[in-house]
UniProtKB/Swiss-Prot annotation:
The chain crosses the membrane at residues 93-113, 128-148, 175-195, 212-232, 253-273, 298-318, 355-375. Gene3D superfamilies: Rhodopsin 7-helix transmembrane proteins (1.20.1070.10). Keywords: Glycoprotein, Membrane, Receptor, Signal, Transmembrane, Transmembrane helix. Its main location: membrane. Residues 31-92, 149-174, 233-252, 319-354 are extracellular. This is Frizzled/smoothened-like sans CRD protein F. The lineage of its organism: Eukaryota, Amoebozoa, Evosea, Eumycetozoa, Dictyostelia. Glycans are attached at N34, N52, N70, N151. Residues 114-127, 196-211, 274-297, 376-456 are cytoplasmic.
Amino acid sequence: MIFNNLKNQNKIINFLIIFYFLSFLKQIESQSINITSSSSSWQCRGDLVYRNVSNRIEDEKIGFNFVQYNGTYQSCVIPCPSPFFTINEWNKFLNMSLVMGTISFFSGLFLLVTYSPIVNKTHNRHTIGVMCMSFGVCLAMCSDMWNFGSNFTEKSICPSPGQYLSTSNARCLSSGIFLQFGGVFGFLNWTLLSFDLFMNIKGIITKNYDKYYVSGTFIIAIIFTFVPIVNDQYSMSYIGLGCWLGSAMYQLIFFWILLSICLIVSSVFIILILKEVYIIIKLSKQKTSLKGNIRPLICISITGFAFFYMFFYYISIVVEGDYYERVLNEYTDCLMDPTKDISECKSPRMSVASEFVFLLCLRLLGIGAFIFYGINNKVKKIWLNSYWFNNSFVEKYISRKSADNDKSNSNGSKVLYRTNNTNNNGSFNTGLESSIIEMSTNSNKEESSLNSVDEI
């Protein structure tokens, strides 16, 4: 019995020893974590973010950019967003992109619906070109929709502090594909529009190659969009608000070279168009051709300016790439140097105005196209001839409204509509036509314009 008591006491003593030993190890581990945390906090000064460098290669694949100091990678990464702009400036860029991108998206969507078979009954090179360009604009502007509800102070676009979006992120990949495909498809069809405008002014009639135009531009856009995925090229850059082609080489091959070719070709057509317009003004009193084409001419010119600005801004960034890389390295070296005070470290900066205009140009394309292709008598005529304004429900509503207006204006001081049963074209319902015409101060002029030759 005595031996049994001793055995029980030994078990208790052993348990207490083990418990004390485990508590001691836990205390040492806690102190070690505190020391490591304190060390990492001291090491990653300023806006640098701590990240253990032991798994650097895998971390770089998911968007972390590690800092080098004295030729060695450190456990610190570049902050996201980058220090090239302040947080306040980044938020201004983001707010502008959300507002202008949304307006541009719905502008492009209106044109897409208007010129599509959903509304438009007849098609030619011009309407197909506008429809395809609008489709590209809508896709490109969709990339901004991913940023709704985000900013750089509370719910950041960056997945985590110091982490940039990369191909491994589904949101990044999808928005990058939309932006790339929409951009390529949009400016290819914009180039075809300049060609179509030149052919129209010259009065040249060619065979119907619409199917080849659409198929060719679509295939090119598909190739230039999905080939970069093979090497995981869609990512967020130091100066971007979202994902696009990450490598400068891929940007050059799969976007800027093609864009420069389109710019050269379209510029030639624009010069030829201006020449023809000058001849029309100088030698002919007929203003029909000039009046019908001046609106799309301005649209193409403004769009060309936007593309040219984006192209030359990109070239300037590439040319000065070594400079920006050097100032960023100098900034991180200063932060990593324990002998220097943080106040001595000068943050790398880029031109806020130039970046703002660059981000704005792409988002103006849909708005510009809407102004010059969506606000004219041609669009009104398309909608008036469409099913949406020629069905039993609308006719009943318009007829009732027209009858009420006739009754309230029976003194004859104002005529809201005229019945025309002899119109060979049979283009519009009278009640619907009068409802639109009453918005104009001159009904005769409006009706005449609706039955005139289609504008481009």
